[in-house]
Amino acid sequence: MRQRILTLLLGLAVLVTAGCGFHLRGTTQVPSEMKTLILDSSDPYGPLTRAVREQLRLSDVTIVKDAKRKDLPSLRIIGATESQDTASIFQDGKTAEYQMVLTVQAQVLIPGHDLYPLNVKVFRSFFDNPLTALAKDSEQEIIRQEMREQAAQQLVRKLLTVHAAEEETQQKAAAAGEKAASRVDQ
């Protein structure tokens, strides 16, 4: 009896989560118009560009290497800045905790349409333990890499907002065209 109730509850939980559109985190459903795009960066082999390229591949996006093509959407990574601010201090006035900020500026260029800016900010805190001076550098590098990966995930997710903005622009243009056509007919 107890086994049947557990099986029933587990089955119900699966149905509820599947029915509401729940998906495990991981890949982002990129719009079909952006399934093939050009990834353009001033540092094509840098860690941020590699992280963005990996996230695009995980989302089944084909990356075209020919940056001269004008018929494909283009994701351009304009720049990234890292900053580090003091979040707390020890009694002796030395920094105890840093807030690390990674800001990424990018833009999506859709041929024959607009240019859409994308901005991503990722925040992390880092505890500066003076007793572990040697481990600090490697820990900071691990945190920076995680921040780059998180920024790359956010950029790929923001492609959905670009797609929505593009559709909205097309709908407004179609509505304006219909209004103009109806005025001419009258």
UniProtKB/Swiss-Prot annotation:
Major site of localization recorded for this protein: membrane
Subcellular location: Cell outer membrane
Biological-process GO terms, alphabetical: Gram-negative-bacterium-type cell outer membrane assembly; lipopolysaccharide transport
Membrane topology per record: Lipid-anchor
A GO cellular component annotation in the UniProt record: cell outer membrane
Residues linked to a lipid group, S-diacylglycerol cysteine type: 20
N-palmitoyl cysteine: lipidated positions: 20
Residues passing through the membrane, by range: none
Keywords attached to this entry: Cell outer membrane, Lipoprotein, Membrane, Palmitate, Signal
Signal peptide interval: 1-19
UniProt cross-references to InterPro entries, sorted A to Z: LPS_assembly_LptE
Gene Ontology MF: a single term: lipopolysaccharide binding
Pfam families recorded: LptE
PANTHER family referenced in this protein's UniProt entry, alphabetically: LPS-ASSEMBLY LIPOPROTEIN LPTE
Functional summary from the UniProt entry: Together with LptD, is involved in the assembly of lipopolysaccharide (LPS) at the surface of the outer membrane. Required for the proper assembly of LptD. Binds LPS and may serve as the LPS recognition site at the outer membrane.
Quaternary structure note: Component of the lipopolysaccharide transport and assembly complex. Interacts with LptD.
Similarity comment: Belongs to the LptE lipoprotein family.
Protein's UniProt name: LPS-assembly lipoprotein LptE
